[in-house]
């Protein structure tokens, strides 16, 4: 079965192919004989009630100096026999939401969207973990700086995050006795106007912030522990963390079993769970990463698992 695979992503010319999960997906789709189409950034539209996109034929190759070739752009109407990989990075701002609404129209026309556009709108990556409270550390989400401060003082040390960030940006560790706590909370809440997440600090972060990948609700057998370096407490690779592959622990599998069935039910075929120690901290649904690192360390083909699920869905 040959499919038209349409990718919505950040500019392909700027990716780092050694680490880019979307690139791994494109390589696998091409290997299977599917036709690749690249959506011009900002190229999704609605025309007379139909979802359309400005796309160009795309070919990819494992060459760090010349990894893609594009043909001429033309308008494509979405419909059956198409798979759309929605792989734009956060922030999930108004333009991102509008794109998911266009993709919902494409879905109704018969295209398969990965991940489900309604799910992308519903699941904030920081808040989605709280749908599984049995998996999470003590957490408070509030605009009230005084309440957030009381939470920090109650737990001694806490991590403070905005709800719309990625890659470890604007994440603070603070605690009782920190002279900067008030200004951190003023900044994150924008004077009690923006929801901010406070989470009890988990000392196990020194052993790594684990990324567990779910494909169609089932966990990959290995995770990537992103280990903070030096005096940094953030393990994110974008913040300088070192990636180390590990087999899943029993607790990791338990967490995956709590989250996976709901993700599959909602059409979230490719999801990244962030786990520190025994606790789930985030559920990443927009553009989860770490496929390339895990494939390289363990000889896996995680994108192959994803396309097995996609092809099974297309055959129904």
From Swiss-Prot:
Belongs to the prokaryotic GSH synthase family. Its cofactor is Mg(2+); Mn(2+). Its EC number is 6.3.2.3. InterPro entries: ATP-grasp, ATP_grasp_subdomain_1, Glut_synth_pro, GSHS_ATP-bd, GSHS_N, PreATP-grasp_dom_sf. ATP binds at residues 151-208. Binds 1 Mg(2+) or Mn(2+) ion per subunit. Keywords: ATP-binding, Glutathione biosynthesis, Ligase, Magnesium, Manganese, Metal-binding, Nucleotide-binding. GO terms for cellular component: cytoplasm. Mg(2+) binds at residues 282, 284. Pathway: Sulfur metabolism; glutathione biosynthesis; glutathione from L-cysteine and L-glutamate: step 2/2. PANTHER family: GLUTATHIONE SYNTHETASE (PTHR21621:SF4), RIBOSOMAL PROTEIN S6 MODIFICATION PROTEIN (PTHR21621). The lineage of its organism: Bacteria, Pseudomonadati, Pseudomonadota, Gammaproteobacteria, Lysobacterales. SUPFAM superfamilies: Glutathione synthetase ATP-binding domain-like, PreATP-grasp domain. Pfam families: GSH-S_ATP (PF02955), GSH-S_N (PF02951). It comes from Xanthomonas axonopodis pv. citri (strain 306). One of its GO terms (molecular function) is ATP binding. This is Glutathione synthetase. Residues 124-311 form the ATP-grasp domain. HAMAP family: GSH_S. NCBIfam families: glut_syn, PRK05246.1. It catalyses: gamma-L-glutamyl-L-cysteine + glycine + ATP = glutathione + ADP + phosphate + H(+).
């Amino acid at each position: 079965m040959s499919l038209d695979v349409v990718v919505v992503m950040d500019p392909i010319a700027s990716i780092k192919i050694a680490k880019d999960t979307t690139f791994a997906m494109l390589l696998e789709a091409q290997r299977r004989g599917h036709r690749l189409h690249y959506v011009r950034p900002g190229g999704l539209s609605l025309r007379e009630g139909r979802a359309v996109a400005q796309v160009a034929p795309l070919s990819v190759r494992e060459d760090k100096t010349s990894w893609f070739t594009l043909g001429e752009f033309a308008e494509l109407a979405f419909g059956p026999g198409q798979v759309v990989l929605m792989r734009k990075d956060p922030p999930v701002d108004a333009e991102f939401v509008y794109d998911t609404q266009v993709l919902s129209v494409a879905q109704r026309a018969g295209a398969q969207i990965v991940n489900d556009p309604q799910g992308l709108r519903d699941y904030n990556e920081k808040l989605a973990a709280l749908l599984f409270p049995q998996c999470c550390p003590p957490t408070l989400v509030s605009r009230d700086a005084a309440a957030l401060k009381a939470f920090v003082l109650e737990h001694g040390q806490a991590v403070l995050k905005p709800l719309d960030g990625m890659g470890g940006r604007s994440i603070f560790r603070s605690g009782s006795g920190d002279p900067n706590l008030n200004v951190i909370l003023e900044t994150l809440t924008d004077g009690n106007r923006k929801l901010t997440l406070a989470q009890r600090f988990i000392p196990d972060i020194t052993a790594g912030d684990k990324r567990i990948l779910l494909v169609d609700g089932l966990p990959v057998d290995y995770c990537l522990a992103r280990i903070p370096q030096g005096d940094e407490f953030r393990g994110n690779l974008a913040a300088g963390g070192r990636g180390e592959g590990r087999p899943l622990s029993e607790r990791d599998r338990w967490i995956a079993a709590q989250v996976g069935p709901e993700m599959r039910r909602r059409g979230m075929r490719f999801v990244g769970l962030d786990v520190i120690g025994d606790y789930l901290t985030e559920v990443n649904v927009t553009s989860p990463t770490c496929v390339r690192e895990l494939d390289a360390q363990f000889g896996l083909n995680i994108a192959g698992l994803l396309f097995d699920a996609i092809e099974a869905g297309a055959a129904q």
